[in-house]
Amino acid sequence: MMLGDTNNRFSASRAVVVLASGLLVGLFLVALLSQMLARIDALDALTQMRLATTLQNLIMFMLPAVAVGTLCGGGTPLRFLRLDKAPSAMAVAGIVLISLVMTPAMNWLVAWNASLSLPEAMKPVEQWMRAQENAAQEATDTLLSGSSVWDLIASVVCVGLLTGLGEEMFFRGALQRICCDGMRRRHLAVWTAAFVFSTLHFQFFGFVPRLVLGAFFGYAYLWSGSLWVPVIGHALNNSAVVAFMWMGNNSIDAAAMDEAGSQSAVVAIVSAAVTVAMMVAYKKILANGKKTH
């Protein structure tokens, strides 16, 4: 199956190779640059982590996505990634409202996934997975360890805005677009991109909620036709985590908001049901909006 316009045909398989190669090369470069940053005594651990995260978003995610967009989009990567289309007010309002409504269900899913354990025969695998989870959590704790207003702003920019943009460019703008054009099965493309998105975070005890979140962003992208919609949703989700961590660093109790619904299956079920209903309505509203333009 070919991608791109009639003047620039590019196979889906080659596009995946370019995207994956860019990710691997970017991973190597970021690891190398991170080691160099660690040797600079003038930089504290928090600053090093912010710089490393920024480099990761730019080199591992944004550049490969732009490369694929350039090759498949006839030299117009913004158009291929759907970054050239401003989202409608309804599309933005919808993803914000749905994100709020789905929070209890997502919190319950996070708690459930974190409580899972593997059979005794697979304990070594579970121990390795827990070690990966703990390492990721330690990195997150370091990245979000600041308590000043400047720390809050810097974390929102780095973790909220840059990560939201970078990951959506890679996983939805590039990977999901390639899968949609190559597979010709939109639902399969959404869930394939979401699966890769969750897997590459290497946080196995948060795999299911991140898979669901990735699919949510994928459908928002699919229905709206603008990558800015999932970028906004992703940035808001990450920024909420940043805000809760920052409040905790300042001894402000935000547990009631951060853990809403995590202990109640009934609340989670109601949240999930309302979320599904809102997404069905969201799809119809966006489809009708496209017909009127």
Listing of model-derived features with the role each one plays in the protein:
Residues G166-T192, Y219-S226:
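Membrane-interface helix/loop boundary segments of multi-pass membrane proteins
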Residues F61-G74, D151-C179, V276-I285:
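Transmembrane alpha-helical segments in integral membrane proteins
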Residues T53-M60, E133-L162, S262-A273:
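Hydrophobic alpha-helical transmembrane segments
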Residues A31, A235-H293:
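C-terminal membrane module of polytopic membrane proteins
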Residues M2-V25, R50-L51, T76-R130, E259-S271, ...:
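Interfacial transmembrane-helix boundary/kink motif in multi-pass membrane proteins
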Residues A20-L33, F61-A67, V96-M102, V266-I285:
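Hydrophobic core of alpha-helical transmembrane segments in multi-pass integral membrane proteins
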Residues L29-G74, A89-L100, E120-Q132:
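Alpha-helical transmembrane segments in multi-pass membrane proteins
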Residues V196-F202, G206-A260:
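Functionally important transmembrane alpha-helices
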